[in-house]
Amino acid sequence: MKCVFIYNPNSGKGKIKKKKDYIYSRLKEKFDEVEMIATEYPKHALELAEKVCEECDYLIFSGGDGTFNEIIQGIASQEKRPVIGYIPTGTVNDNARNLGMSKNIKKSMDIILQDKQLNMDICKLGDQYFSYVAALGSFSAMSYATKQKNKKLLGVLAYALNGMDDLFHGKNFDVKVTLTDGTVYEKNCAFMGILNSKSVGGFRFNKEADIADGLIDFVMVESKMKNEKPRSFVSGLRIFKMFLRGIKAKRDLKHVIHFVSDGATIELKDNVVWCIDGEKGDTGSKKIEMLHHHVKVIVKE
């Protein structure tokens, strides 16, 4: 069997680059052939993943949630898709929480070599694939708007500081969501998230999520309640409370609407920017599809 290992040499303060010989030796315990490839520029992991699909049985990679998305983007449209394994070295690592992977390289390598596989769902928004979240509105731009040097220096705190502006100046948007069964939700929102994840932004606010059940979680935070003027600060606090309490705490979160579906059409009046797996995406109205059990991924036993 052949394994390709793709790694971002700059992720995790260069930790993977220092440990690549160790990773190679561990992979050789299982695979007859191991090829190590370092990414050299943005979206390179996507290009590499797409290229190696036909030639490898396993695709192991390291990086943050952005790298995870690039790998998914690269393999999801291919007819032959290798089993993927992940060593998290990013700042937040939401995908790692879903899979039970560790930032400790030895522990992650142990899990990868145990080779317990899960048929993971993948979502498609327009022509973009994503593994765990697509979002609109306040705080959704934090991950891609935060400078890389600040992430390295401050970690998760860098995201929090970058999001303070949204707390006071977040913009609301009108959205109409039509589910595959015909149900319609039409609201003025401060935030909307489309989730296939237990964790987003480091917050485990969707603990009951199953990344292989064929269903997508939708959560909308209304920006205006009855007899209330829309205020970005109030809306921001509502979003923050939702992340802290979880989307199931409906008694305390009357402004939060949560529902599930296997797909939807999302209509936006304005060209609001999408955040896809923590990266800047397209703008405007989109169709979302669920690709059930689309990718085999290694998970913790």
What kind of feature is each model-predicted range?
Residues 31, 56, 188-189, 260-262, ...:
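Short, well-ordered alpha-helix to beta-strand connector turns
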Residues 171-173, 188-190, 212-217, 262-264:
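A generic structural signal for short beta-strands and their flanking turns/coil linkers
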Residues 30, 39, 77-194:
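Catalytic core of DAGKc-family lipid kinases
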Residues 135, 139, 193-206, 280:
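Glycine-rich phosphate/pyrophosphate-binding beta-alpha loops
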Residues 179-181, 210, 220-301:
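ATP/nucleoside-binding phosphotransfer catalytic cores, i.e., glycine-rich phosphate-binding loops
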